[in-house]
Design a protein with these regions (language model features):
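Short amphipathic alpha-helix that is part of the acyltransferase structural core
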Residues: 1-35, 148-188, 192
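Conserved donor-binding loop and adjoining core beta-sheet/short helix segment
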Residues: 7-8, 17-109, 113, 213, ...
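Polar/charged side chains located within well-ordered beta-strands of beta-rich proteins
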Residues: 17, 93-94, 110, 172, ...
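Short loop/turn motifs at secondary-structure junctions and domain boundaries
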Residues: 37-41, 199-204
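Acyl-donor-binding surface of acyltransferase catalytic domains
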Residues: 65-67, 81-160, 294-299
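Conserved acetyl-CoA-binding loop-helix of GNAT-fold acetyltransferases
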Residues: 85-98, 239, 245-258, 277, ...
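Active-site/acyl-donor-binding loops of N-acyltransferases
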Residues: 124-143, 207, 258, 263-305
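Extended hydrophobic/aromatic segments used for targeting, binding, or gating
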Residues: 223-224, 231-234, 245, 249-255, ...
């Protein structure tokens, strides 16, 4: 049975996703609830697939509210490993497709990391348009370089820079502007970012770091952490254009890895477009190793503009 997601489903959905995902992304009960608080213009809808009282699948569909191009939809879902091949994913996608039609999405983006998911999307009219390298590091097994702070700069945990949140937002959006993507991420207000990113339950204010020039944030390494399951995800690493090529991103990201190692985190995941050589090289220097190539897929008459 397919039904609408309810907030009380969050713990079971988080457990489902941790088991269904082949790569250890950060997914907590609080995150699942937080994802439902997208801006109203996203017109988000979420479903679960039930087998008796057990949740065996989950999917969402919405408009990409953070891009200025209109009528761009976004979908993704997962099915418990032991339940695959029974039509659960297809049933969820039927609900997704009906919602996409109701919100008049002209183009739809999704992604998949492994061949079964990629075949599922292709069979439903999607085509691969970009690829990302998913990489991982066990922070306990690496000794990242780059901890010498250049003169005039200061490294602090995010918690100690929250009074400069609007300036951190400017650094974040500079990173978004330069990161290759299917659709340009250019339609986020500070208030939306404050709720969606800074307010994310897993964004660790001790494990994320900010580089200050004087008192001005100029580089960031944001880290999402699941302390219970000892896993972490790099949310954003970025530097203002005028301060690049000084090792500041490496400084901040290395600090987050050292912090994660001290916490006992066993895996830090990151994703980078394969046409982003600078960030790929930085991650290689810090000890990240490739896990899988994620395909980014689009369904629609013309693809991204």
């Amino acid at each position: 049975m397919i039904r609408a997601f309810r907030e009380e489903d969050a713990a079971a959905v988080a457990e489902l996703l941790r088991g269904a995902l082949e790569t250890p992304w950060v997914v907590t009960e609080a995150d699942i609830v937080h994802w439902e608080r997208s801006p109203e213009r996203a017109r988000r809808a979420t479903w679960v697939a039930m087998d008796g009282l057990a949740i065996i699948g989950w999917a969402f569909a919405q408009l990409r509210w953070e891009v200025s191009e209109e009528r761009v939809g976004e979908v993704w879902g997962a099915v418990a490993r032991e339940q695959r091949g029974r039509g659960v994913g297809a049933a969820l996608f039927d609900a997704v497709d009906q919602h996409l039609a109701s919100i008049e999405a002209a183009k739809v983006q999704s992604w998949a990391e492994f061949d079964p998911g990629k075949r599922f999307l292709v069979a439903r009219g999607f085509r691969e348009v970009r690829t990302e390298r998913i990489s991982s590091v066990d922070p306990r097994s690496t000794d990242p370089p780059g901890l010498d702070t250049p003169e005039g700069f200061r490294l602090v945990p995010l918690r100690d820079a929250l009074d400069r949140a609007r300036e951190i937002f400017a650094v974040y959006m500079a990173g978004e502007a330069d990161a290759p993507d299917v659709f340009e991420v250019d339609n986020i207000s500070y208030e939306e970012w404050e709720l969606e990113t800074l307010g994310a339950p897993s964004l660790d204010r001790d494990g994320s770091f900010v580089v200050l020039h004087g008192e001005r944030p100029v580089s960031i390494a944001l880290l999402e952490v699941d302390r219970e399951h000892k896993r972490a995800t790099n949310e954003m690493t970025a530097t203002l254009p005028d301060f690049r090529r000084r090792g500041l991103a490496r400084l901040a990201k290395a600090a987050s890895l050292r912090w994660a190692a001290e916490l006992g985190v066993t895996s830090v995941l990151t994703s980078n477009d394969r046409e982003n050589p600078g960030m790929l090289a930085l991650n290689d220097q810090l000890g990240y190793r490739p896990l899988v190539v994620r395909g980014l897929y689009v369904r629609g008459p013309a693809g991204p503009d």
